[in-house]
Amino acid sequence: MTEWIKVCEENSLKDGDLLDFDYKDKKILVARAGDEVFATDRICTHAYADLSTGFMNTDEKTVTCPLHMSIFKLEDGVPQNLPAEQPLNTYPVKIEQSWIYIFIE
């Protein structure tokens, strides 16, 4: 089933915030960089590390895995360095009536 899932109020996610969000069997990272909000898989593709405990670079729009320091672009999930080689899944995001939604298939 594909649907838009309500995550949180827009004003509760500040610039640089990394939010962990679970929906059914998916572990999702919701991140804010300036006026943009991104949603990706929350678990590093190299090792089972939770990216919501990682480090965000708002200028580069990236998140760094806290375990082995792989960097992922939030826009498309592509890893920028080793050891990660596989991209994160990304999810469409919309803001409607001050709420952040992500689209999950």
What are these regions (language model features)?
Residues 2, 16-19:
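Intrinsic disorder/low-complexity signal
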Residues 3-10:
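Short amphipathic
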Residues 18-104:
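Rieske [2Fe-2S] iron-sulfur-binding domain
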Residues 1-2, 105:
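Absolute protein N-terminus
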